């Protein structure tokens, strides 16, 4: 499946293949496009290849013995596959890793400053104040060791640290993981504000399909290293297959039990 490229697409991933340890093929000809200034959702179950896709874009595959063996990643008209991560960050791409990867033994403010290591020091104060505007809890705890914060606060810190880099494209990997529904709603609302106020393009990887599609303009669904469905977010939310297998709803609008949903691999109509 080939992604449709328009003049507004700032990121194009075309026919991408990724192999780990020279033997394990994880991405199998994946293609997608991200429109500038929008939030795009990338959905799928565990093991579908979502995180690998983000790492292929951000250049972090090499640290895990991964390699792009075919296809291309083009950002703002320039190929970036094969470029080292620091150069990719300098081009305006920043990834927030799954699992709240923060420095637990230093303070909140010191964590934030680490996010701005590619920026001029003259920007630090202004950038930190901007982060505190979006995340007031971080301002309240700026002198606290990050390891003593709650899971939701640590996720806010991870996103805030990314904002310190002044990204043009923000890659978010499972920001809702392990968080209570109210915190998920709060964090997604803040991400939406950052997108609108700062003009930051967002590629959002999630298993929480409803939350992700509710803030996105477009979405892609992955299975087994391939894109199996794509479209505008609203059309995906209204799609019976997506409702049944990713939102837990039956065709009559009834909640599906896990026992029903777990059979979806044998029944996915979009794979034929």
Where do the PLM segments sit?
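ABC ATPase C-loop
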Residues: 162-163
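Helical segment within the ABC ATPase nucleotide-binding domain
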Residues: 185-199
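Conserved ABC transporter NBD signature motif
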Residues: 68-78, 124-126
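ABC ATPase nucleotide-binding domains
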Residues: 249-272
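The feature captures the beta-strand-to-loop junction immediately N-terminal to the Walker
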Residues: 43-45
